[in-house]
Amino acid sequence: MCGLTGIIGFEDINIFKRLHLESENRGYDSSGIVIIKENSLFHIKDSLKTSELWNSKKLKDFLKLINKDHVKFDKKTFFLGHSRMETNGFSIFQQNNQPIIENNTMVMHNGILTDNPEHTDYTLSDTRLICKQISSYFNKKFFDFKNFNNYFKSLKGYHSLIFTNTLSSELYLISNNKNIWYYHNDE
C-alpha cells in the first residue's frame, strides 16, 4: 500500500527528501509533501511518482514560495511525505491525493477501508471520509482522543495514519496493524 514518511527536528530538507524517495516503491500513483512550521501548514500534492514530484518545477516553485515567506527550517519543523498506491478514489482527481486537508485537519493515510457503509462513492478517496471524521474530534486546541480511538477501532481494514490540526501543535501517529517504525534521537 502507500508509503508514509516523516522527519521532525532536522533543518536540512535533503535528509527528508532521501527518506521520502525511499518510500516511492510503496506507491507510484501520486505523492504529497507537508511542511509544518509554527502552526503553519504548507502542502503540495500531485498525480506524480515521488521522484517525479521532487524533480518537478511545481515543487521547486513551492519551496521558493515558502522561502519567500521567510520560513526557516529548524528543530521544530515537521516534514511529512506520502507516496500513494491508488485503492479507493482515482488519483487523477487531485481531491483524492494526499495529504487531505479539511476543516484545519490534515491526514495522510496508508490502508484501505473495507465494508464501510459511509463509503458509497468509490470515485472518492476513503481518506477523505477519515479526515472528515477526525476533524470532528478537534475542538479548538483540544483533541477528543477517547472518541477518536473508538472510531478508529471501528474501521474495517488496515490503517496507519498521520494527522494533525493547524490549531494544535501535536502530530498524531496511529496504526491498527503495528507497522509504524520510528527512531527517536535525544539530541
Language-model segment annotations:
Residues M1-E187:
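Conserved short alpha-helical segments that host acidic/polar catalytic motifs at enzyme active sites
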